[in-house]
């Protein structure tokens, strides 16, 4: 099988950063991608578990990747499957993710289901010998995150998550500058994310409310902190290269009094 390597210099050039040492000091996980191999005849046979709005957004990119073959779709909501088939018309359809994992020909899965379901699916996928991309946030609790990490380590399978800022050239460049001391000593960081929408999606029937608007209910979601603020919190830890020792926060439902039970504002 023929391999065409992309040089580290070209890889870094594409990020707009000149020095490998500085880059990898700021973003050490990129070392795994510093020599990318283009294979001539192999594709990753991928299953999408949860091809809802986020899953289909990712499918839009994957469908253009010549090294990916989306071979399976799994969802309990028929309209999601119907829309996903427009992007992957030859994919096999499933209603139970466990049946997907039984298919030995599938190399990897992409998990874009409600947060509360991530851990079980990911653990089962590792046990089935699959590589995993799991959308953020990874787990419903810290204990779940630890279990998934340990399973990843014990199985040796690839585990990737959707914290996209880690690969955003703008953030990588900013961290390079921060860690190089360009702005002096960093004593405080303030991050913001403002949205003025109600975070709701229309439902065809009231009995589908929690299935479709799962982000609004504590049974399935941790609300704004895991669905949006996780990106901002990551920036702080990345910039300071530290994990917080203490955390204080507050939130409330002050505007969208529509039956949701997660806060509509947090800080």
Q: What residue ranges belong to the model's regions?
A:
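N-terminal secretory signal peptides and thylakoid transit peptides that target proteins
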Residues: 1-19
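N-terminal Rossmann-like dinucleotide-binding module
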Residues: 15-88, 168, 236
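Predominantly a Rossmann-like dinucleotide-binding segment in NAD(P)-dependent oxidoreductases
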Residues: 50, 154-161, 165-260
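Conserved SAM-binding strand-loop segment of SAM-dependent methyltransferases
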Residues: 92-96
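N-terminal Rossmann-like NAD(P) cofactor-binding module of classical short-chain dehydrogenase/reductase
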Residues: 109-110
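Beta-strand-loop-alpha-helix segment that lines the small-molecule cofactor/substrate pocket
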Residues: 114-115, 119-167, 181
